[in-house]
Amino acid sequence: MTDAYVGAIDQGTTGTRFIVFDQHGDVVANTYEKHEQHYPEPGWVEHDPLEIWENTKSVVTAGLSAAGLDADDLAAIGITNQRETTVVWDAASGRPIHNALVWQDRRTTSRVESLEENGKIERIREKTGLEADAYFSATKTEWLLDEAEPLKLSSARASSLRDRARDGELLMGTIDSWLIYNLTGEHITDVSNASRTMLYNITDLEWDDWLLEEFDIPREMLPEVRPSSDEAVYGHTDPDGFLGAAVPVTAALGDQQAALFGQTCFDAGDAKNTYGTGSFYLMNTGEDAVSSEHGLLTTIGFQLSGEPVQYALEGSIFVTGAAIEWLEDVDLINNAAQTAELASSVDTTDGVYMVPAFTGLGAPHWDGRARGTLVGMTRGTRKAHIVRATLESIAYQTRDIAAAMEADSGVSTTTLRVDGGAVKNNFLCQLQSDIIQTDLARPEVDETTALGAAYAAGLAVGYWDSLDDLRENWRVDRSFEPEMDPSEADSKYGRWEDAVDRSLAWATED
């Protein structure tokens, strides 16, 4: 099949993108719209699901128009999405009962702490591969069923939200499910997204009864779990809808798993790091679900139709690109492009370390009460030092993960494939290579998350025949090798660890 294209909807934390790819994996059209971030209280982060859906329709329509294509020119559509972000909606009206609770949202931290106090953390880890955290969908869904009650009272029916969910009147899903539902009318998720809910047993490959009971979440509201690339097809777009054609929707992957797939990390030991709002370092572990002893997550990487699940180890860093946004928020820079110029204007940070724990710390620390910290400042500190320290924090956090990854897997990564908006910054890429003392490879196509969704969708309909076809598409834009002496990198990293210690458990409750 060569006379068509594949489309990928990339629904991210800050906006929604639609990219059309050709058979070489090259971008034919790329359109994007931001959506509003809602912060109703400190530590709370919400998105409007209806705004996301409207933006999705807008970027898909604009992308096809920009490429001079009709919807019939698409062989398939794949979806990739911000993971863990949770929506509950009315099955009849299709309207959400509340804003989506975003993966960064920390409102359920105390609930997670109660799980720890009651000795349930290890059992959750055994079933899900996850560290119990407010990051995941389980406590978000529980909160919505408990606390969205006032929004429901305007409806004709006065029964509880849980009763309505048990009766099939309310549906829950991550953003992939929300988009699949609006595109096709089907209530579906894929294994990679299901594995991020803290409700899915990644060994038995099913929603877990014990977890559903713990969080009092009715099974009836959960989506059907399907392969990430599904020859059986999730559904088709409505020919009477906004596209005017019945396009098959055949794939879904959480954004980081999609990047793993787009970077063609198909074999055990292959690893990538994506630098976005947060950073996410994943290593393919094949058919083995490797348990972590060093604060990493065991997660599902992807599943192709008729094939076994492929697992991955993951290090989740909550704040990287968001730290650059913070520099803009406090007027230290005007735009992200300034960071390289400012950071390279000084040789060092002059002893300044920045720990961007604005929403707590993820792997390997898993401290929801850690907070952002700047240490080591003097009267001689200038904004260039702070900007450089912020970029260095991205590299140090990645080294945290790389060390844990090697300890858990027994595999030393020789070349780390990198992607995401921040890797356009050559200064950061070289710094990252120096700090982790590992070669970096940046691909020509930098939209690897969307590319992974497109690859998965295209495989399902025979647009590409095999994984080997995809491997042939992968091309290096630039490689980076360590230039820093290993002893210097170790010394800098040691001081980073001291700075992290000062950020931990800062946001204690009275």
UniProtKB/Swiss-Prot annotation:
Keywords: ATP-binding, Glycerol metabolism, Kinase, Nucleotide-binding, Transferase
Catalyzed chemical reaction(s): glycerol + ATP = sn-glycerol 3-phosphate + ADP + H(+)
Record flagged with keyword ATP-binding: yes
Annotated positions binding ADP: T13, R17, T277, G321, G421, N425
Pfam families listed in its UniProt record: FGGY_C, FGGY_N
Protein EC: 2.7.1.30
EC class name: transferase
Pathway membership: Polyol metabolism; glycerol degradation via glycerol kinase pathway; sn-glycerol 3-phosphate from glycerol: step 1/1
Molecular function (Gene Ontology), one example: glycerol kinase activity
Top-level taxon of the source organism: Archaea
CDD domains linked: ASKHA_NBD_FGGY_GK
GO terms for cellular component: cytosol
Residues bound to sn-glycerol 3-phosphate: T13, R83, E84, Y135, D255
Record-stated family: Belongs to the FGGY kinase family.
Protein purpose: Key enzyme in the regulation of glycerol uptake and metabolism. Catalyzes the phosphorylation of glycerol to yield sn-glycerol 3-phosphate.
Entry protein name: Glycerol kinase
Protein encoded by which gene: glpK
